[in-house]
């Protein structure tokens, strides 16, 4: 069958977590798994960071479950709300609740994520897709992440 790459990136478009899921599955069910794998090592005796300041996501990640997860971990959700959810909320009137907080200025930084995915998909090792096993496909995605990080890091 088919596979799909899921990854979390930092503000520079560098992948922090890379996973491969089923191609026919949605993106939002993989989000809690991606977030649980997030580990950012820091220099010295500073503890490992597992909580980002904010998560920028598209409308596919605008679910109550994801927003509740982010709220429970004190992570700011910068996720646009789909029109159908806006309509359902307004149809319920005062019982529909307030719209979720949305920072349009921060959301403009989401293009970094899209450019990161574009770079992964344009890389010949993954674009040609000779790998038949999900394991080797993930290995290729991780190798591409290593290339990106090696270009970024200066010694």
PLM segments and residue spans:
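Conserved, well-structured core segments
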Residues: 4-7, 17, 118, 135-144
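Conserved active-site beta-strand-loop modules that form the wall/rim of enzyme catalytic pockets
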Residues: 4-6, 14-17, 27, 53-54, ...
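Solvent-exposed alpha-helices and their adjacent loops that cap or buttress functional pockets
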Residues: 1, 8, 47-49
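Generic alpha-helical structural context detector
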Residues: 33-36, 118, 145-148
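Charged phosphate-binding loop/patch that engages nucleotide di/tri-phosphates or the phosphate backbone
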Residues: 140-155
């Amino acid at each position: 069958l088919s596979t799909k790459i899921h990854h979390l990136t930092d503000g520079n478009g560098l992948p922090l977590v890379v996973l491969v899921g089923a191609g026919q599955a949605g993106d939002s069910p993989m989000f809690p798994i991606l977030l649980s794998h997030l580990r950012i090592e820091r220099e010295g005796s500073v503890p490992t960071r597992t909580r980002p300041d904010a998560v920028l996501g598209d409308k596919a990640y605008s679910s109550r479950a994801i927003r509740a997860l982010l709220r429970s971990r004190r992570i700011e959700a910068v996720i646009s709300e789909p029109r159908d959810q806006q309509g359902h909320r307004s149809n319920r009137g005062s019982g529909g609740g307030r719209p979720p907080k949305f920072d349009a200025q921060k959301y403009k930084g989401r293009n970094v994520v899209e450019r990161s995915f574009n770079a992964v998909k344009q890389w010949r090792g993954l674009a040609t897709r000779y790998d038949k096993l999900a394991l080797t496909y993930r290995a290729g995605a991780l190798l591409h992440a290593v290339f990106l990080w090696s270009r970024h890091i200066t010694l």
